[in-house]
Amino acid sequence: MTSLKMCTSVAAVVAIAMSNAMVASAHSFPESETPSAGQQVASAPAEVTINFDAPIEKLFAKLEVTGADGKNEAAGAPQISDDGRRMSVKVASLKPGDYTVKWAVVGIDTHHTEGSYTFSIASGGS
């Protein structure tokens, strides 16, 4: 009976260790964006926001919003929510046209992820 209890205890410890490893290895990827990828908005947004599926490190967060001229329209550094899952940046008065949002983050698991997407502002929407 003692060996059965020992095997059960070892199995429980291994299961807990494996579940913790799976949680720790989760990378941070966008769940949603505002404006969203591919969206054409009627008026210029005051800010661009990305919601992540896992917390990100504030120190390593980057968010750029560029127009056709390549100029970064972000007004300052990105702001990170208290729970670390939301990154936003204010933008200057954007004119109608196409914009590319480029982001790069480091999750609390220390893994770097990055990506980009586009949105557009309809004519007359500045």
Question: Where is each model-derived feature located?
Answer:
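Bacterial N-terminal signal peptides that target proteins for export
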Residues: M1-A11
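Cleavable N-terminal signal peptides
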Residues: V13-V14, A24
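N-terminal signal peptide c-region/cleavage motif recognized by signal peptidases
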Residues: S19-V23
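Extracytoplasmic/periplasmic copper-protein system
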Residues: S25-E31, Q39, H112-S126
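Short, surface-exposed alpha-helix to beta-strand junction/turn motifs within ectodomains of secreted
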Residues: V48, A54-E73
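Short strand-edge motifs at loop-to-beta-strand transitions and within beta-strands
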Residues: R85-V89
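A glycine-anchored, Pro-Gly-centered beta-turn/N-cap motif
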Residues: K95-V101, G115
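Beta-strand-rich extracellular modules
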Residues: A104-I108
